[in-house]
């Protein structure tokens, strides 16, 4: 049987797409999930201290608000449980093909169908929604000798809780978002922790990360509109912050001054303080939030190593100054394949086009959601739809305001739909024109940029503008073949 829609992934994006498709009267669709459980990022990232840095009321689906959050900024287990609850409430589990890893997605022009090859067999679909997300594939560091390490190795996104860290010498590579949350949790139990830092991060204190009071939960449950009001107040606060990222970069100096005061208060050692001081504009790389990272870094069993890594040997990490730092456990907090996401390499469209090329700056896209050489294929979390200041869930729902009507039209008219190349080029050029005047155009090296230095990741404007631009399916912007 040919599916109307094949959805790749069952995290926030896949679940939201399923609910929106069903609400639009579209049936005969399925989610393909390579794991044995739903949840995506929040299923996979189980490292100690893992939490969201967007408020719980905002980092949730608009049609599935949760009045029972226990913390204003939730930890991983509660977010994963929220996704499980969403699937249960909307009866989505039966739509998920668990343990189905997609190996290839190729368009059959003669049949006007997408052919999906999985480890459990082959499928066909009239439409495809890629909802695997940008944080799906863990990136191990490209360091000589990593495979020769005699101890135990793991990535924060593939945490192995069976590894006992008590009394161990631990090497942590990376000081990004995962590391900043995880390091304070392992320092008290490790005998020694070496933290390898390439670039210092801007870190702000977590001003509002606190347990939700009982009376607040009762208000959310029984006072109509109360939680909705809090959600939107948080949204607009973040949009004001976004102005500094996108239009008023000089205002970031206030945040940089505040971050410096926080760092100076926590780190009294001038040498360590200097090592932890960023040399780029705040926001060019992801801004981190933590009350516990700096206190962890001043503990007597912690060393911050900024000397470059030469190679990894059986007994530890050798830096470029020739010193061998012995370790029992190697933890890689080295992020994900974002601008070169492997899922893009699996998708083959017209004229032998490969979707991954869009992230290399070689292919235009439309609304970060569709591509001219990939008919009836759509992508959540596509080019320039990630954020540096607000909730990605808002962006997913905005994209679906375009994607679902487009799919509904294609099914109703039995049509093949793809954005006109001229419209895709127009959209992509507009994004590129915006970026140089934003904080992401100030010259730092980050995972927001592709190999060519182009911002292919972050939306360089206010999110409410994106919501307006994605409102509905504009037939005049598309090539339509019946």
Which ranges hold each PLM region?
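Core beta-strand elements of the Rossmann-like FAD/NAD(P) dinucleotide-binding domain
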Residues: 3, 118-127, 166, 320-329
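Beta1-alpha1 glycine-rich phosphate/pyrophosphate-binding loop at the start
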Residues: 3-7, 12-93, 197-198, 265-269
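Rossmann-like dinucleotide-binding core of oxidoreductases
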Residues: 6, 10-12, 16-37, 130-260, ...
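Short beta-strand to alpha-helix junction loop
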Residues: 66-85, 246-254, 280-292
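Feature captures the FAD/FMN-dependent oxidoreductase FAD-binding
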Residues: 71-136, 311
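Alpha/beta-hydrolase fold catalytic core
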Residues: 260-326
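Glycine/threonine-rich phosphate-binding loop and adjacent beta-strand/alpha-helix elements that clamp
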Residues: 333-407
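C-terminal active-site-capping segments
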Residues: 394-397, 401-482
